[in-house]
Amino acid sequence: MSWSILEFLRKNPEELKNNLKRRAIDVSLVDKAVELDKKWRQVLQEVERLRHQHNVLSSQIPKLSGEERKKKIEESKNLLKILEDKEKELEKIEVERDRLLSSLPNLVADDVPNGPDDSYNIPIKFWGKFKVYEGDVEEFLRQTKDANVNYEIIKWKPKGHAEMLEDVLHLGNTLKAAEIAGSRFYYLFNDIVWLDFALLLFAIDYITQQGYTLVLPPYMLRGEVIQSVIDLDTFKDAIYKIENEDLYLIATAEHSIAAMFFKEEIEKDKLPLKFAGISPAFRKEAGAANKDLKGIFRVHQFHKVEQFIFSTPEDSWKYHAELITNAESIFQQLELPYRIVNIASGDLGACAAKKFDLEVWMPAQAKFREMVSCSNCTDWQAFRMKIRYVDRKNNKRGYVHTLNSTAIASTRTITAILENYQREDGVVEVPKVLRKYLEIFPKAPKDYIYPLKNKII
């Protein structure tokens, strides 16, 4: 086992403890892992000594005869039994140690802000022209302090996306969906459905033009696999499990794509491998409590296009920058104003060494909301899934690095369009970049989405 965290455990456990402190996690986990690894190495020495003794004994037996031969054969059998018991003990300790190591989060990158929660996240970039209601200017300036941002003041108060969707456009119904399925479900109709499809087509069109292979992945994964992709103990309240089946619904195509090379080796000269996955995403949102109960911002199901890269360790930071650049290009083409946030250590999640969020300005809410999450997971997932690269020229093996980023999460992006592209009369302009994906369908909206006079249901 050659994961970097084991090397840290042996050479610099204090640095590993500091990593856990940065994440606001109990450092005693490191002490337990150190003790298990120490015990493992002690038992390994005993196993190797016993193997050597058994090999020496086995080599002597063919040269012997009579009672001495019988005596040595019996001695060999007894020694083999002791060896087998020690090997079982070694395996048991190794499993326990590796289970504990697998529960530890990734090593935080040096340039990640320190802090226990999202209040320590640091905005590092702003893009676009922000529409700000005159009553929200002070709050907007507070959220963009020390940044040179371009904004326009509007005198009318934009309506929230939930009100636009259900009460103005009459193109959605969450109340009926809640009646038959529970909260955080929805019915969407006509132009909003077309908008959903257009966003997905635009995202996969753009990302595949950047050299990514399009993937339609499995929507479910076995328990062993999903546990390797994410920290399932932490996220068990976020992932749906199929009753009486060892299957879990994916929360993003990242999960299935990450597992594409489960327990396999990849030739180093084939890296990087870049994929664009399109799939539904299923999320319990159990930890969301009473957040975003109205509308379609935080829901149990939505469509998503995901970027994913398998990389060599030396190139992974380059590809992390590429992923967020791709995401920025998508939202720039949509002309949705946003900021990029460097996520604090305590808000990262176990998988990521570093994460950027892209947050779009929502003028009705007077706040920035997350649309994209872009992570470098280094070798955390690869270690757990046993995905290695093979460098045959240098006779070397190592764990690949895995990286992921949202391209489009459809419902969230629709909320951003409804708030940023609405007019005072309730009409919503269709972003120009999406229009070519709609023009081929006679019933799809072309330039504008107009309010219906009556509700569909």
UniProtKB/Swiss-Prot annotation:
Q: Name the Gene Ontology molecular function terms of this record.
A: ATP binding; serine-tRNA ligase activity
Give, as one word, the top-level EC class.
Answer: ligase
Q: Which PROSITE patterns did the record assign?
A: AA_TRNA_LIGASE_II
Instruction: Detail which positions bind L-serine.
Output: 252-254, 306, 406
Stored SUPFAM superfamilies: Class II aaRS and biotin synthetases, tRNA-binding arm
Write out the entry's keywords from A to Z.
Aminoacyl-tRNA synthetase, ATP-binding, Cytoplasm, Ligase, Nucleotide-binding, Protein biosynthesis
Catalytic activity reads: tRNA(Ser) + L-serine + ATP = L-seryl-tRNA(Ser) + AMP + diphosphate + H(+); tRNA(Sec) + L-serine + ATP = L-seryl-tRNA(Sec) + AMP + diphosphate + H(+)
Q: Which residues bind ATP?
A: 283-285, 299, 370-373
E.C. code: 6.1.1.11
| Location within or outside the cell | Cytoplasm
The family database entries (Gene3D superfamilies) matched by this protein are listed as: Bira Bifunctional Protein, Domain 2, Serine-tRNA synthetase, tRNA binding domain
CDD domains cross-referenced by the UniProt entry:
SerRS_core (cd00770)
Q: In which pathway does it act?
A: Aminoacyl-tRNA biosynthesis; selenocysteinyl-tRNA(Sec) biosynthesis; L-seryl-tRNA(Sec) from L-serine and tRNA(Sec): step 1/1
Which GO terms are recorded in the biological process aspect for this UniProt protein?
selenocysteine biosynthetic process; seryl-tRNA aminoacylation
Quaternary structure, per UniProt, is:
Homodimer. The tRNA molecule binds across the dimer.
Q: Which family does it belong to?
A: Belongs to the class-II aminoacyl-tRNA synthetase family. Type-1 seryl-tRNA synthetase subfamily.
Identify this protein by name: Serine--tRNA ligase
Q: Which gene encodes it?
A: serS
